A protein has these predicted regions:
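Extended helical scaffolds that flank P-loop GTPase cores
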Residues: 1-252
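Eukaryotic, compositionally biased intrinsically disordered regions
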Residues: 254-257
C-alpha cells in the first residue's frame, strides 16, 4: 500500500544518492591530485631546494655578476612558482564551480558558489622584496664596497627569510581555502545521507507498526468471533429456558421426567 510505495521511493532516492556519492569520491580524488600539484609549486620543500641551490651558487661565486644573477634567479623562480600556483588555483576553482552546480541540479544540494582565492598578496610581497634588494643589496656599489660573504649573509637574513614567511603564509591560506571549498559539499552530502537514513528508518518503523496493527486487528477479530459464538450459544440456551418456562406445569413435569 502507501507504506510500500514510500519505502520504494526512498530506496530509489538512496540508490541515486549512492551513485552521486561515487561521483563525489571521484571529485575528491581529482581534487587531491590538483592540490598536490598546487603544493608542488607553492610548497616549502620547493622553496627550500631553491634557497639551498641559491646559497651554494652565491657562496661559490667568484664574480659579482654571478652573485647578482643568483639573486635575480631566486626571485624569478619564486615568482614563477606563485604564478603556477595561481594557475592551479584557477583550475581547482573552475572544477569546484562545475561540481557545485552539478550536485545542485542532480541532488538539490544548496551549495552556492565556491569561495575564491588569490596569491596576489604574496606576489606583491615578492615584488617589494626584490625592489628592496635591487636598491640596497644587488647593486654594483654594494658588490664593490662589501665582502661577498657579507652580501650573501645579508641576502639570506634580510631577504630570503621574508620570502619564506610569504610562502608560509601562502601555504596556510591555501590550506584554509581548500578546506573551505570542500566543506559545503561535504556538509551537504553528509546531511543528505543522514536525512535519507532517517526517512528510511521512519518508514520501516511505520511498516512494522502497520504489521503489528494488522496482527492486533486479526487477533481482535478472532476474539470477536469467539465472543459472537459464545453469545449465540448463550442466546440459544436462554431461548430454550424461556420456552421451558412458558410451557404449562404438566408439560414441564413430563419434559423433566
Amino acid at each position: 500500500g502507501v507504506v510500500e510505495y514510500m519505502m520504494s521511493k526512498v530506496r530509489h532516492e538512496k540508490e541515486e544518492f549512492e551513485a552521486g556519492l561515487q561521483r563525489y569520491y571521484a571529485v575528491r580524488s581529482v581534487f587531491s591530485q590538483m592540490t598536490n600539484r598546487l603544493f608542488g609549486h607553492i610548497g616549502l620543500e620547493a622553496l627550500r631546494n631553491l634557497t639551498t641551490s641559491t646559497r651554494e651558487t652565491m657562496t661559490n661565486a667568484t664574480f659579482s655578476r654571478t652573485l647578482s644573477d643568483a639573486m635575480k634567479h631566486f626571485f624569478s623562480v619564486s615568482r614563477q612558482n606563485l604564478n603556477k600556483s595561481e594557475g592551479e588555483i584557477a583550475e581547482i576553482l573552475a572544477m569546484m564551480d562545475a561540481v557545485y552546480k552539478k550536485f545542485a541540479v542532480e541532488h538539490g544540494l544548496k551549495l552556492g558558489s565556491p569561495t575564491t582565492f588569490s596569491l596576489l598578496r604574496q606576489q606583491k610581497e615578492i615584488n617589494r622584496l626584490e625592489q628592496w634588494c635591487d636598491a640596497h643589496l644587488n647593486t654594483t656599489f654594494q658588490m664593490l664596497t662589501h665582502d661577498k660573504n657579507r652580501v650573501v649573509q645579508k641576502f639570506f637574513e634580510e631577504v630570503a627569510t621574508q620570502v619564506r614567511r610569504a610562502f608560509e603564509r601562502a601555504n596556510r591560506d591555501a590550506e584554509s581555502w581548500l578546506k573551505a571549498v570542500m566543506a559545503p559539499m561535504e556538509t551537504q552530502v553528509r546531511e543528505h545521507q543522514i536525512q535519507l537514513k532517517r526517512r528510511l528508518e521512519s518508514i520501516k518503523r511505520i511498516h512494522q507498526a502497520t504489521e503489528t496493527l494488522e496482527d492486533r486487528i486479526n487477533e481482535l477479530l478472532h476474539v470477536e468471533s469467539d465472543l459472537v459464538t459464545q453469545v449465540q450459544g448463550i442466546a440459544q440456551v436462554a431461548y430454550t429456558v424461556q420456552r421451558l418456562l412458558n410451557q404449562p406445569l404438566v408439560e414441564r413435569s413430563t419434559l423433566a421426567a
